[in-house]
Amino acid sequence: MKTQKEITISGVGGQGMILCGTLIAEAAAVHEHKKATLSSEYGVETRGTFAKSDVIVSDEEIYFPDVTEPDLVVCLHPVAYARYAGKIGGALLLYNSDEVTPDEIVPGPQKGLAITKMAKELGNPQTANILTMGAIAGLTEVITPEGAKEAIRRFFKGKSDKVIALNEKAFDLGYGAGCGLREE
């Protein structure tokens, strides 16, 4: 059984993919004592250009830090979907169904999740990245909810209890949705 998971989280700048990947790597390495690597790519503009975060989590040593054979590719924006759809082998492609219209002829498994809508229903569209983190955790079981929430609390330390609670709620909502997708 493969103990290493390779995940690409992609979209455009301003959607929080870098933070999402960072928190997954921290949850795995610091709070769950696994091995993890993180790399990011983004344009010089802070918003609107392609951006991605690559995370590898393993129970064993990781000898090459870049994602080469992804298990999961997350696309939060049409720009990212166009870049990866049909080009990722047998990896599962998880897309934000509020932003991306999937191409039905693209080979390989694809699943949509209404990430933007769920974030708006929580009252804060900026929680979409934490929702995505939860969905990834629920879908892949790469990190536990406990480890994820420790990373969330550490990152938002110094913010109000309301902000921390909102982000934990966003994680839980995404986690439940991800578990549901895993069971499909």
PLM regions and their residue ranges:
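Active-site cofactor/cluster-binding pocket
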Residues: 1-184
